[in-house]
Amino acid sequence: MKVNTLPLVYSCSGCSSAAQLANALALRLTREGLAEMSCVAGVGGGVPALLGRARQPRPKITLDGCALGCARACLEREHIDVTVSVDLSRHGVRKRRDGSLIDPDEAERVWDAVIIPALAAANAGVSA
């Protein structure tokens, strides 16, 4: 799939372990050529080039570490439709603010059980 047709993925990258897991999963989607990560801070900050990219007719996936949904909120604030929104806390990911590293077993479980199905839904144009 060409880069300009891949889903765009926006992730939380806050200070908790759950946020860092969301960011790591978005990076993995990009590294594996399954999606193109874009800058949620740029969308939230109203940066014209990043708003232009976010408004492209491509599926959008948001990956948030917790129920605050900051990545999703940044896009919605700009009236950008999110195709699939993932809240990792709804899938058993606990938010730790103690500087804990990402648990590789948890990352793999979430990848298989949550991220791959979310990607399939986004590619099918199914809102989830």
Descriptions of predicted regions:
Residues 1-128:
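Iron-sulfur-associated redox domains of electron-transfer enzymes in respiratory
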